[in-house]
Amino acid sequence: MAKKVDGYIKLQVAAGAANPSPPVGPALGQKGVNIMEFCKAFNARTEKFEKGMPIPVVITVYTDRSFTFETKTPPASFLLLKAAGLKSGSGRPNTEKVGTIKRSAVQEIAETKATDMTGADIEAMTRSIEGTARSMGLVVED
């Protein structure tokens, strides 16, 4: 028989840097999950990512206080800034452009995010990522 689900916790944690301090500790503590067990498992699973890269994670907590978790791909905004070599996007993206990014780089990001996105095809996902780039003040070039 399947375990009964007590709840879900969605967090964004830096790869290889999960520790009991906020936001991880309080979120897991409310559900009675062993915080150190999660931190060790998360850090082991995310060691292949660049250290400090934000990784979305969905933690499923069961009534017996056990848990499973699923890691997602890094946010598109983070990948776009990394590809463009920038620290942050524009505060006024319509008037103030902060950088440029090649369409091929946008396509690579769309392929990376394909497992988490609900696009019909790779072109639709690429257009979605291009929209994110424009909203951050990046110009997409061919």
From Swiss-Prot:
Ribonucleoprotein as UniProt keyword: yes
UniProt entry keywords in alphabetical sequence: Methylation, Ribonucleoprotein, Ribosomal protein, RNA-binding, rRNA-binding
Subunit structure, as described in the record: Part of the ribosomal stalk of the 50S ribosomal subunit. Interacts with L10 and the large rRNA to form the base of the stalk. L10 forms an elongated spine to which L12 dimers bind in a sequential fashion forming a multimeric L10(L12)X complex.
One Gene Ontology molecular-function label: structural constituent of ribosome
HAMAP family given in the database record: Ribosomal_uL11 (MF_00736)
Free-text description of this protein's post-translational modifications in UniProt: One or more lysine residues are methylated.
Pfam families found in the cross-reference section: Ribosomal_L11, Ribosomal_L11_N
Identification of the protein by name: Large ribosomal subunit protein uL11
Cellular component GO terms held in the UniProt record: cytosolic large ribosomal subunit
CDD domains for this protein: Ribosomal_L11
A single GO BP: translation
Presence of keyword rRNA-binding: yes
Function: Forms part of the ribosomal stalk which helps the ribosome interact with GTP-bound translation factors.
Family named by the database record: Belongs to the universal ribosomal protein uL11 family.
Domain of life: Bacteria
